Amino acid sequence: MNPSSALMPKATAIPGCILRTSRQCSKHNQTSGIRASSSTRQYHVAAIESPARRRRDSTFMKRSDFIQARNFHATKVLAAIPDPYKVLGVDKGASAGDIKKAYYGMAKKYHPDTNKDPGAKEKFAEAQSAYELLSDKKKRETYDRFGSAAFDQNGGFDPSAGAGGNPFAGGGGFHGFGGGFGGGFPGGFAADINIEDLFGAFAGGARRSGRGRRGPFQEILVGEDIEVQTNISFMEAAKGTSQDIVITPLKECGTCKGDGLKEGAKRTQCRQCNGTGTRVHLMQGGFQVAATCDACGGAGLIVPRGSHCGTCKGDGVVRERKTVRVDIPGGVEDGMRLRISGEGDAPPTGTAAAPGTRTQRGDLYVSIRVSPDERFSRSGSDILYTASIPLTTALLGGEVLVPTLDGQVKVKVATGTGTGDRITLSGMGMKKLGGRSRGFSPNGDLKVEFKVAMPKYLTSNQRTILEVLADEMGDKTARRIMDIPRDGLSTAPAADASSGNESKSEGFLKSAWHKLMNHKKPAGSENSSDSSSNKDSNSSGDSKKSE
């Protein structure tokens, strides 16, 4: 054990975070012999730095002889779309045919199914994107004018905005925040605000230019809609028709031209709100609430007393009687509404804030009521018709006349048709709204449902025939009340079963039929029998005389 180690403090008594050791080795020249080198271990205690000082020191984490520098850089710039002309290898003045030819060549060369090169798929995708851009006339014109920035989805640039327009409308704009401010905040803060409309209002309207200062918002007065109802027949709904509808909409006053003022009169500033359009109310607790001025309606201007137009009473609009011809297309259903744009009421411009306020008439809505038809019923574009057929036609088959939208047609009835059986006549139904679909008929179908008419009362002849039919069909459950001789149907001797039964049954059916139809024997047969009897009597008398 080294004697000096007893004088050393224990390492555990000093915190490890501030304990540093150093080892010094010394060599002595060998004079009289070899002397072992002695090693000395020294402990150095570093002063503890305060946390505040370490925070102020920018290098307290790691002390070194060099200064550590940290560089700040902007976010990586998004790569712009490649030049489509260079991708396809054509000039900017190339025709559509040259562009198409170049694209087909690249597509054939770099198609992933034929070219297994790892980079072929990427080149094929670039060629597709380039051709899609250059094949569209508008997209190509936009690219030639603005470059790749016009198609940057993250740039928010709209090349069609123009001067005074909304450059943030393209590429999504502010719509990424949940459809305006309302989508980004719980509770629906201003959920109905459209940021593009808001920007357009502050910009003074998109695509509008002009000198002079404009207001921050452009007011548009929209008139009320008019709703009317008209009745049409089932056939008119199927074929389409036109109707004249009388309405009484509001129109611009011809006397004041919509100003609501007399000739030479002007609006004056509202004294209640001093032209601001709002009035501030002081509430309890020092709160202030701003509300729309009830005197001017928020316009800030009022019409002086006695300056109103005598025709429209200051509203700027008057009612007129008008006839509108409405074209009702074929295929409309009961309860549908047709909208005729711009045929509603004109807005009351006499109450507008400024004489030059933009206006827009309302719309006319026509509700269609279709009267029911006695013969047909409807299911969408299909027509349903119930055809009543006799019992004999249902059993034996035949043809019946079925009415359609274009007249009557003959329909074959299969043998054994029962109640509820249907047949479909394709393309003979209602017209389908929305245009003709490819591969499908523009009209619906006519579905005919058969109903067998069962007789409630039978004559004696009809019942006799049916009872005979029941006997022929072996129906033992049918009720029989007619007195029909059935001796021919009785069992015959076994020896005569083959031929005798047939002749007897045939004779029975004939006799039953003659009895049913009240057939009498022919007159010739009776005369012949009488003459034969007379001859027999005469011959017998002659024989007696001879005796």
Swiss-Prot record:
InterPro entries hit by this protein: DnaJ (IPR012724), DnaJ_C (IPR002939), DnaJ_domain (IPR001623), DnaJ_domain_CS (IPR018253), HSP40/DnaJ_pept-bd (IPR008971), HSP_DnaJ_Cys-rich_dom (IPR001305), HSP_DnaJ_Cys-rich_dom_sf (IPR036410), J_dom_sf (IPR036869)
Record Gene3D superfamilies: DnaJ domain, Heat shock protein DnaJ, cysteine-rich domain, Urease metallochaperone UreE, N-terminal domain
Compartment annotation: Mitochondrion
Main location: mitochondrion
Entry keyword Mitochondrion: yes
Keywords: Chaperone, Metal-binding, Mitochondrion, Repeat, Transit peptide, Zinc, Zinc-finger
Molecular function GO terms recorded: ATP binding; heat shock protein binding; unfolded protein binding; zinc ion binding
Record keyword Zinc-finger present: yes
ZnF start-end (CR-type): 240-321
UniProt CXXCXGXG motif repeat ranges: 253-260, 270-277, 293-300, 309-316
GO cellular component assignments: cytoplasm; mitochondrion
Compositional bias per record (Basic residues), positions renumbered to this chain: 512-522
Transit peptide: 1-79
Biased composition (Low complexity): 524-541
Stretches the record annotates as Disordered: 484-547
BP terms from Gene Ontology: chaperone cofactor-dependent protein refolding; protein refolding; response to heat
The protein's name: DnaJ homolog 1, mitochondrial
